[in-house]
């Protein structure tokens, strides 16, 4: 019999005795398996808690780095939007974090979205909006996000967003990390798919309101090119219900070029 030592209570001594008492081999093996499983589970949980930030950091680095994007003052992009069999000229002008304007030319008319210092407006003759009309709510927030060059994932903490790693998923044969981002501003959820091989963004999924209805929109990013150390996807293909409804192809990108701020005013 084991006697109580080290000032332990009888109950504590009983627990010690259980560990000291020889156990049958099969029981030892069973206990060891449970301990090993518990340790591995804790290790996995710990790794998961760190992985989402590690994936985002690797993605940010692959794109050129958050600091580098934040140092860019202005951005000009030009290209074409392919929609319903038409190729429409597109221009985008951004003052990083402050202002954004994009123009699409359609049959001699212009569809314009603009944002500056918290206010936004739009013109869309094809939708009956022939003069500059203020935008509010989710649409205004979308314009504001477009004025920021860095992807919301890169500095999600500073913006107050929530992120969650949802595991891995194949996207058209590419193994990716799947990350859910919930916006602090409007609760909108965007899911990002980042390649496990080169840490580049392959696809994003979000909801968009079109003609009074909400649709899930998939955006695929391809033809990535380097401009002064920063990566840009020159082709962005958008699908809903598995069908392509729009494709944007940029033909030129200019960084830190003069932009007249008056173009953002109504």
Q: How would you label these PLM feature ranges?
A:
Residues 50-61, 122-188, 209-215, 259-266:
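Flexible, processing/modification-adjacent segments and terminal tails
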Residues 118, 125, 171, 196-197, ...:
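Short, ordered coil/turn segments that flank beta-strands lining enzyme active or ligand-binding pockets
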Residues 54-128, 164-165:
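N-terminal mature ectodomain segment of secretory-pathway/periplasmic proteins
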Residues 90-95, 112-117, 131-140, 194, ...:
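Short amphipathic beta-strand/extended segments with alternating polar/hydrophobic composition
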Residues 1-52:
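Bacterial Sec-dependent N-terminal signal peptides
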Residues 175-265:
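Gly/Pro-enriched, hydrophobic low-complexity segments
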Residues 86-88, 100, 106-110, 172, ...:
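Subset-of-secretome marker
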């Amino acid at each position: 019999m084991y006697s109580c030592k080290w000032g332990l209570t009888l109950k504590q001594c009983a627990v010690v005795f259980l560990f000291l008492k020889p156990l049958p081999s099969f029981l030892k093996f069973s206990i060891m398996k449970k301990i090993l499983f518990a340790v591995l589970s804790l290790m996995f949980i710990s790794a998961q808690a760190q992985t989402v930030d590690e994936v985002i950091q690797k993605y940010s680095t692959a794109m050129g780095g958050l600091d580098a994007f934040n140092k860019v003052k202005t951005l000009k992009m030009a290209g074409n939007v392919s929609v319903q069999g038409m190729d429409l000229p597109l221009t985008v002008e951004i003052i990083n974090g402050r202002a954004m304007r994009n123009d699409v030319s359609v049959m001699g008319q212009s569809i314009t979205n603009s944002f500056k210092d918290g206010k936004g407006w739009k013109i869309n003759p094809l939708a009956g909006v022939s003069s500059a009309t203020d935008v509010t709510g989710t649409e205004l927030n979308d314009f504001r996000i477009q004025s920021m060059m860095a992807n919301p994932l890169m500095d999600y903490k500073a913006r107050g967003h929530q992120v969650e790693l949802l595991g891995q998923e194949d996207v058209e044969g590419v193994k990716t990390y799947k990350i859910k981002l919930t916006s602090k501003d409007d609760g909108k959820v965007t899911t990002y798919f980042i390649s496990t091989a080169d840490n580049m963004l392959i696809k994003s999924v979000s909801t968009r309101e079109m003609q009074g209805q909400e649709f899930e929109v998939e955006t695929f990013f391809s033809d990535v090119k380097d401009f002064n150390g920063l990566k840009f996807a020159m082709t962005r293909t958008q699908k809903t219900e598995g069908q392509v409804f729009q494709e944007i192809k940029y033909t030129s990108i200019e960084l830190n070029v003069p932009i007249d701020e008056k173009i953002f005013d109504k």
